[in-house]
């Protein structure tokens, strides 16, 4: 082994295997690009992004950790979301939840 070497199993690694997903059509109605990171609570993203926010409560993008999706002005694209896991407590971001999200996705 080389110091710092990462040894992974052979084959493909499926991200978020077995998790429920939601697909949403998202439009950037603003005049600036908007970039959303992999673990940002999608319900609380910039208000220039128009989509069904209630479906995004308790969800994040279904993309690899450390990556992001960029929405250029006027862009409209479909994204896939997965539920936040763990304690399902959401604090910060834009301050819209600041507490627990129950199993149905509603603030608790």
UniProtKB/Swiss-Prot annotation:
<comment type="similarity">
    <text>Belongs to the urease beta subunit family.</text>
</comment>
<dbReference type="InterPro" id="IPR002019">
    <property type="entry name" value="Urease_beta-like"/>
</dbReference>
<dbReference type="GO" id="GO:0035550">
    <property type="term" value="C:urease complex"/>
</dbReference>
<dbReference type="Pfam" id="PF00699">
    <property type="entry name" value="Urease_beta"/>
</dbReference>
<dbReference type="InterPro" id="IPR050069">
    <property type="entry name" value="Urease_subunit"/>
</dbReference>
<comment type="subunit">
    <text>Heterotrimer of UreA (gamma), UreB (beta) and UreC (alpha) subunits. Three heterotrimers associate to form the active enzyme.</text>
</comment>
<dbReference type="GO" id="GO:0009039">
    <property type="term" value="F:urease activity"/>
</dbReference>
<dbReference type="GO" id="GO:0043419">
    <property type="term" value="P:urea catabolic process"/>
</dbReference>
<keyword id="KW-0963">Cytoplasm</keyword>
<keyword id="KW-0378">Hydrolase</keyword>
<comment type="pathway">
    <text>Nitrogen metabolism; urea degradation; CO(2) and NH(3) from urea (urease route): step 1/1.</text>
</comment>
<protein>
    <recommendedName>
        <fullName>Urease subunit beta</fullName>
        <ecNumber>3.5.1.5</ecNumber>
    </recommendedName>
</protein>
<dbReference type="InterPro" id="IPR036461">
    <property type="entry name" value="Urease_betasu_sf"/>
</dbReference>
């Amino acid at each position: 082994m080389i110091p710092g070497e990462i040894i992974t199993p052979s084959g493909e690694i499926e991200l978020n295997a077995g998790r429920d997903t939601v697909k949403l059509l998202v439009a950037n109605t603003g005049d600036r690009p908007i970039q959303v990171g992999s673990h940002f609570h999608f319900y609380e993203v910039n208000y220039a992004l128009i989509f069904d926010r209630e479906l995004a409560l308790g969800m994040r993008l279904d993309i690899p950790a450390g990556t992001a999706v960029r929405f250029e002005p006027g862009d409209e694209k479909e994204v896939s979301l997965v539920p936040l896991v763990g304690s399902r407590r959401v604090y910060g971001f834009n301050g819209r939840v600041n507490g627990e999200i129950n199993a149905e996705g509603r603030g608790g």
